[in-house]
Amino acid sequence: MIVGSLRVRLLLRDSRSLKDKRQVVQSIKDRLRQQFNVSVAEVEAQDNRQVVVLGVAMVSNEARHVRATLQQIAEALRRHPVAEFLDHELEV
């Protein structure tokens, strides 16, 4: 069993409130779950209206598949129209 994790930091410059942030974060989480079949949670900075830290996890029997999927997720978030990609950490 191979477990992979991805930690991504994003910046929401236009977020005026925690409610604005929650709407964007929920949309991102739902899309990642649906498109990639992974577990996603906001893991840090919940009280900061502009910073988002997401944790993504997945399990597979092939390390290559886990790494490729998590890299695809990082690239998808890098291209997100609302959130600015700050950095990421990937572990397999």
Question: What is the meaning of each model-derived region?
Answer:
Residues L6-L10, L54-V56, H88-L90:
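A structural signal for short, well-ordered beta-strand segments
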Residues V3, A41-E62:
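Short, charge-patterned binding micro-sites
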Residues K21:
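C-terminal binding/interaction regions
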Residues M58-V92:
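C-terminal structural segments of small proteins and small subunits
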Residues G4-R13, L18:
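Short glycine-/aliphatic-rich beta-strand segments at the starts of folded cytosolic domains
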Residues V38-V43, F85-D87:
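A short linear hydrophobic-aromatic micro-motif
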